[in-house]
Amino acid sequence: MNQEVMNLFNQQAQPQSFDQIKISISSPEKILSWSYGEIKKPETINYRTFKPERDGLFCARIFGPIKDYECLCGKYKRMKYKGVICEKCGVEVTLARVRRDRMGHIELAAPVAHIWFLKSLPSRIGLLLDMALKDLERILYFESYVVIEPGLTPLKERQLLSEEEYLRAQEEYGEDSFTAMIGAEAIRRILQDLNLEKIAADLRQEIATTTSDLKPKKLLKRLKIIEAFQLSGNKPEWMILTVVPVIPPDLRPLVPLDGGRFATSDLNDLYRRVINRNNRLKRLIELRAPDIIIRNEKRMLQEAVDALFDNGRRGRVITGANKRPLKSLADMLKGKQGRFRQNLLGKRVDYSGRSVIVVGPELKLHQCGLPKKMALELFKPFIYARLDAKGFSATVKQAKKLVEKEKPEVWDILDEVIREHPVMLNRAPTLHRLGIQAFEPKLIEGKAIQLHPLVCAAFNADFDGDQMAVHVPLSLEAQLEARVLMMSTNNILHPANGAPIIVPSQDIVLGLYYLSIVADGAPGEYKSNNPLNPMQGVYGDFGELEHALASRAVTLHSKVKWRWKGLGPDGEEVTRTYDTTPGRVILSSVLPRHPKVPFDVVNKLMTKKEISAMIDTVYRHCGQKESVIFCDRIMGLGFSHAFKAGISFGKDDMVVPENKWTIVDETRALVKDYEQQYQDGLITQGEKYNKVVDAWAKCSDRLASEMMNRISSVQKDEKGADKQVNSIYMMSHSGARGSPAQMKQLAAMRGLMAKPSGEIIESPIISNFKEGLDVLEYFNSTHGARKGLADTALKTANSGYLTRRLVDVAQDAVIREVDCGTDAGIRMRAIIDAGQVVATLATRILGRATAEDLVAQDGSIIVPKGQMIEERHLDAINKAGIQEVKIRSVLVCATKNGVCATCYGRDLARGTPVNQGEAVGVIAAQSIGEPGTQLTMRTFHIGGAAQIADSSFIESSFEGTVRIRNRGLARNSDGDLIAIGRNVAVVIVGPDGTERAVHRLQYGARVRVDEGDSIKRGQRIAEWDPYTRPILTEVDGIVAYEDLIDGQSITETTDESTGIAKRVVIDWRGSARTADLRPALAIHDQNGKVLKLPRGSDARALLPVEAIIGVDPGARVKAGDILARVSTESAKTRDITGGLPRVAELFEARRPKDAAIIAEKSGTISFGRDYKNKRRLSLTPHDGSEPVEYLIPKGKHIHLQDGDVVEVGDFIVDGNPAPHDILAIKGVEELAAYLVNEIQEVYRLQGVSINDKHIEVIVRQMLQKVEITDSGDSEILTGDQIDRTELQEINEQLVSEGKKPVQGVPVLLGITKASLQTRSFISAASFQETTRVLTEAAVNGKVDTLEGLKENVIVGSLIPAGTGAMIADIKSIARRRDELIMAQKTAESGAALQELPAAE
């Protein structure tokens, strides 16, 4: 009896736990098995009684009762009749909740095609039948007949016939001699008649024998879909519906509004149309209506069902009464408002509140101020429980009353409840994991949340009206994780780069900077030759120093001697004397005592960088707890001294340099000179523009440095003591606020402005803000500023979308094991750009594991293989002069379905080796996406000062001796050494004989050093003209023109504004008559014979279009002289895609617009006959394989000559290389290095630091797929793309069976494509193109094993990262154990069965 009572209450279905989800096409039988009855009427509810109509869309007989345990007519009420079916109204007495899961169905009078399988590209039905979508639609929408059985007639199977053709054929061959049908019945019949095995065998045969390039791809696609149907158990004819399922009524509710109107879900309208048309069709068929009418009705039924499944996919969008498109079933799933993203991936959270934030400078780092009112509301259940436990209330109702009246005991209990119960604070937008942190609440009056100033950087919060949300972790486990993982004190380092993020800013920095300033001649300073008071300014005790400060005997900035007592290297007490200031001594008083944290850490001017370094030092040596206490103290110190300093900002602090107008006038003269040169035709319009912009940029920089010199120099008063430092300089130099660029605009000149198009306006703004702008200048300045505002809005959206794609592609990269045991690694070296070390080797390898022993020169091992490189190793590595280290990387990690901790290295946010279960993919995505809003959106046009100035020379960054590799140098007529070879490199060798740097020289560069020269740091190695590309001669001789025919291939142009003539090569390929010309300059000897080059080819320089010829025929030239030049301007101002678009382009692995052409093999170049308007260039490889041909568009400047030798990977035509080419030609490691460097470059320009490993994680995810090149002994087809792990599994099995393994090459996918091709269809469907993903998954009968994070969030189980990773591991161990036991039991029972007959 008891059991039955329990069963009554256990009505709710327990949540099922499952390990995988399968999706497939449902058969008509399956739909009927779900259904509780057929819906025959389009009515919904009776407008008078408000009861659902019988057999209608809300029928209670089919879907269940409207009220719990009550039938519709009211005959049976209450629980005792549970399960009874009322004989009057036919309703089962049960819970009303069943109306959420009982389905119905509609029997269609004619079959209709499922629009997803028809129209979702590629059309599945079309692929399967090998018919065009156009033809299929003509059949389905009753425009054409299709022949199904041609019989003995000359018609072909599946031939389309129009109405007239059909009738004619019937007359001609007789009605029964062939079968032709129309509509979905026809397609269904064809699908039913398919023999999949036979088609598959034929296709395999055809693929094996076909010779063309494109055909196998098409056949492969078709074969794949046929195999999908064979393997998944789906039948092709199920893609044509004969029954339409109807979803439960409570999922498409009809809600009465006041005023007798109803709000309804769009689905009800769509279902109503289907039922109406279906019923009308049934009636017409019964009445034996004419064919044409029935056909029209069938077409309308097909359209109604199409609209129900996916409105707007075909034909017009069906709109409701208010002209708004109706939301179909497909629309319910897709997009930001769809089921996946709106309700499954992001849900609203209870126990949360939000309010404005204000600063809480007296809080400790782990605290936040929570308004009492808010706390009372959030912690209500806890308060009720505690009131009950303490006996203040007997029932919840009483407790409610007490809380509502806010009785004194309630506040006491609130205090108890809140103690040690962390809350989570979140600021939107949450761009990285530091956007949600846990704090211990401290109750405060008022209505605003108080936030600790040091965590503002992590939240990117300020106090100008920002709001934050509070969430309460309820369960004990949640509280535990909030405290251990999310507490603000546990998030001191930035996950993107491992630098401290709890860094003082603004006032605090200013206060600490002021505290550490040194002033000459301040009262009470120590003088070494002070006969009157030799001990003045000598202090050994902190109390004494404070006393002196209080009595004004000494200032914070006076120079004093200080006896410091601290710990020596071995922890012993030591005393040292330092020259310092009282301010710095005060600062040192908050430092933790530790041998590695000496007084030197604070004995310097504390800028923001220095403070960050100091916090870093304290964290690395003293641990987390000390650092947190230290940060809080330092914050207090900074605030109090910023307040005491009283630094203000006045107009007189902005000092305009006296020589401003002199510099401006000089520049004006220079610009005038350039104008004149342009008038005289010496330079082109583009070159003039570049030079003018350059001149003004230099002027602006000079003024800025003059101003900085003035502002930063300290003035003396009449006694010779230092006056106070300029306030603006203090703010900027300390890093508290403002940058040199802003100061330049305030006091020097505003400088060059950009147009909205991104070009720079030639005339700069000469005034500064102190002097004020005139009208024209103001207009120019608003011009660019408005563009900036518009950009910011776009940028935020773009950056958010990039982050979303990154998270999606990387979400399942989780640390699965400690070490995958691979021996592979990638080589790391310092990054050097234009002779400057941009990223040192030490910073790049810190916190990574070595892939081989790291050996010093004496043979001792610095770091053994597989060990982490720590800070303590860096000195030894630098001393050993190691230039390259092979380290482990996630790119080569061999772990299946994740990465291993050794390949990943250090967890940057903790400074320790990464834990198992850490979701490194998501961290990588957030680290790259979060600074996205700081990147620029514009594409730079070459021509700005910045782009050109830094690329016209190379300076040495090391001392050493010069060696020249591939020596191709010549002295020209001016006696300069010119690089005439393509691969000339200057190598700088250090004193110990190691190569310090290798610089490849630009073709045509003037070289300032020669073999064996010794070179100093900063010395020029070479320089070149950045505005033009020269075409040089490599031998001495006499110039001769070839194929340079006036008016056909060469023209004398006269610049209209200058009247000076120059000879320019024009496009000669326009007409057929001149298409075969090959304009060139040849070098002859005395007798008029073409000279030979050392490598054997003729001394002839082919000229590109728009080359400007600089020599006359018959002129004598020396090797290294310039024959012609191509203005880089006229080679079209190439846009450099910068900032966010560039990062997106790289991650999406798109082919750049003007992609470089890369040599696939090492070999010799020769020019073939031109083809149409392209140059033909062929590369004969050294290894004797077939020559490779390249067709190059005519306008491109090819800087190679006949007979030049190129190495693998050399550029044949300049430009950005396509990542796919790098992968194919140079392999994975080179590709990764290229992507990492290019992406880092964009971030570096903005001063954002991201660790390489984050980019590597994303690149690993982009390289998940492999293209099969040789299918070995497997069923896989050549040309197919499969997962890397899948390939490993297949090969392991093949090898174990002694068969030939499958060979494949890695394929690079962009992040969007990679996300859509993950093994989990749930994850892909919730990302983009939901319809297409689900259609494909259903056809393939895909199984989602729920391995990634996203799928698990969607199905509502614990994610397999962090704590969930451990639970997932335990589950899989248990599953394996169960399988073993089951196998064992089966074997035992089998053995027992064997013994049975013997027992008889």
UniProtKB/Swiss-Prot annotation:
Which top-rank group of organisms is this from?
Bacteria
The alphabetical list of record keywords is: DNA-directed RNA polymerase, Magnesium, Metal-binding, Nucleotidyltransferase, Transcription, Transferase, Zinc
The record's section on Gene3D superfamilies has:
1.10.132.30, 1.10.150.390, 1.10.1790.20, 1.10.40.90, 2.40.40.20, 2.40.50.100, RNA polymerase II, clamp domain, RNA polymerase Rpb1, domain 3
| EC class name | transferase
Question: Which reactions is this enzyme annotated as catalysing?
Answer: RNA(n) + a ribonucleoside 5'-triphosphate = RNA(n+1) + diphosphate
Q: Which GO terms describe its molecular function?
A: DNA binding; DNA-directed RNA polymerase activity; magnesium ion binding; zinc ion binding
- For this protein, the Enzyme Commission number is 2.7.7.6
Q: Which GO terms describe its biological process?
A: DNA-templated transcription
Q: Where does Zn(2+) 2 bind?
A: 820, 893, 900, 903
Report if keyword Iron-sulfur is assigned. Answer: no
A GO cellular component annotated for this chain's UniProt record is:
DNA-directed RNA polymerase complex
Q: Tell me the residue numbers annotated for binding Zn(2+) 1.
A: 71, 73, 86, 89
Q: Which residues bind Mg(2+)?
A: 462, 464, 466
Cofactor comment: Binds 1 Mg(2+) ion per subunit.
Necessary cofactors: Mg(2+); Zn(2+)
Q: State the protein's purpose.
A: DNA-dependent RNA polymerase catalyzes the transcription of DNA into RNA using the four ribonucleoside triphosphates as substrates.
Write out the similarity annotation: Belongs to the RNA polymerase beta' chain family.
Enumerate the PANTHER family for this protein. DNA-DIRECTED RNA POLYMERASE, DNA-DIRECTED RNA POLYMERASE SUBUNIT BETA
Name the HAMAP family on file. RNApol_bact_RpoC (MF_01322)
Its quaternary organisation is: The RNAP catalytic core consists of 2 alpha, 1 beta, 1 beta' and 1 omega subunit. When a sigma factor is associated with the core the holoenzyme is formed, which can initiate transcription.
The protein's name:
DNA-directed RNA polymerase subunit beta'
Recorded source organism is Methylobacterium sp. (strain 4-46)
